[in-house]
Design a protein with these regions (language model features):
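Short-chain dehydrogenase/reductase
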Residues: 2, 40-41, 85-88
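Active-site-adjacent segment of SDR/Rossmann-fold oxidoreductases
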Residues: 4, 21, 42-52
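Hydrophobic structural elements of the Rossmann-like NAD(P)H-binding subdomain
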Residues: 12, 54-57, 67
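Residue(s) in the substrate-gating loop at a strand-loop-helix junction
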Residues: 16
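Active-site "substrate specificity/gating" loop of NAD(P)-dependent dehydrogenases
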Residues: 22-26
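Active-site helix of classical SDR
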Residues: 32
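Hydrophobic alpha-helix immediately C-terminal to the catalytic Tyr-X-X-X-Lys motif of short-chain
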Residues: 35-43, 47, 57
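C-terminal helical subdomain
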Residues: 56, 64, 72-117
Length: 121
């Protein structure tokens, strides 16, 4: 797939906050999301040389069937899927590549979660 991606392309890979923080409820889920974040951070510099951006999007809780309604706390806020889709579209225009972007609420802007040693601004 990557050899066929043209210069100017933008790739957004969906991870999760579980990919950048401990998630003791489901360690295997966390492991898979950490792998996504690592892949994006590793591919960023290489793809940048080809004019391609890649981002990991790490949202918090989203209103999907992964957590059944009867298991949800009434005090926990879930973001709407359509809001997340809008955020992903916005990432297509970000030029800083190989970064992990977090979104914890619909009311707050997304932000970069820097890797250790990342000195970019």
């Amino acid at each position: 797939l990557l050899p066929r991606v043209a210069s100017g392309a933008a790739i957004v890979v969906t991870a999760s906050l579980a990919g950048v923080t401990p998630y003791t409820v489901d360690p295997l889920y966390a492991m898979s999301k950490h792998a996504v974040v690592g892949l994006v951070r590793s591919l960023g510099p290489t793809l940048s040389k080809r004019g391609i951006t890649i981002h990991a999007f790490c949202p918090g809780r989203i209103d999907t069937a992964i957590i059944p309604h009867e298991q949800r706390s009434k005090d926990v806020f879930f973001m709407r899927p359509e809001h997340i889709a809008t955020e992903i579209l916005g990432l297509m225009n970000e030029t800083e590549t190989g970064k992990s972007w977090a979104k914890v609420s619909e009311q707050k802007p997304r932000f970069i979660i820097r890797a250790p040693g990342d000195k970019t601004k």
